[in-house]
Design a protein with these regions (language model features):
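Aromatic-lined, polymer-binding surfaces characteristic
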Residues: 10-11, 17, 27-171
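Low-complexity, Ser/Thr/Pro/Gly-enriched N-terminal "stalk/linker" regions
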Residues: 1-20
Length: 171
């Protein structure tokens, strides 16, 4: 249960598995907030304090589900009109959410779980591929949408690109 935009300040069930794409409560901020995965940090901190494996199990299950069910828009031409249509709308892949995911939630997954059984093997490979995909989207499409580099969204998107580079310096 999370309190998110559109829920009237009341905790709402986001699904098990999480429904990442359905716009609920007639508020686009709800979908965007769910896809920022801000609740992961609290679970990772709880794991660090308690050692209770239910927390990283839930975070990695949600991450695996998101990667499997929310593919990046494919074959988007590198022009401003197509970039806006693909990455500046109510979807899990709106550029602002792509950036925020990298520095606010996926960075925390990397920070807390790297070197553990929770982020190893094939799961780490899927995670690294998804981070690289996020970095590609941010590096190609954010400058197309904000060509004058004059928008606060671009700052958060570029911060996401920085954190993606910090997570995968050899990619």
């Amino acid at each position: 249960m999370l309190t998110l935009p559109g829920t009237g300040g009341k905790p709402a069930f986001i699904g098990n598995p999480v429904d990442w794409a359905t716009p609920r409560y007639n508020d686009p901020e709800y979908t965007w907030s769910v896809n920022r995965m801000g609740h992961w940090l609290a679970m990772l901190q709880a794991w660090a304090l308690t050692g209770d494996d239910r927390y990283p199990a839930r975070v990695t299950a949600e991450m695996d589900h998101w990667i499997a069910t929310q593919p990046c828009p494919a074959d988007v031409p590198a022009d401003p009109t197509d970039a806006r249509a693909a990455f500046h709308q109510q979807s899990p892949w709106r550029l602002l959410e792509v950036g925020i995911r990298m520095y606010r939630s996926w960075w925390q997954v990397h920070r807390f779980l790297s070197g553990t059984r929770w982020l190893a093997g094939e799961r780490y490979d899927r995670f690294a591929d998804a981070v690289a995909q996020h970095a590609h989207v941010l590096s190609v499409y954010a400058p197309l949408i904000w060509p004058k580099y004059n928008h606060n969204h671009l700052m958060m998107e570029m911060l996401g690109l920085l954190y993606a580079a910090l997570m995968l310096p050899d990619h």
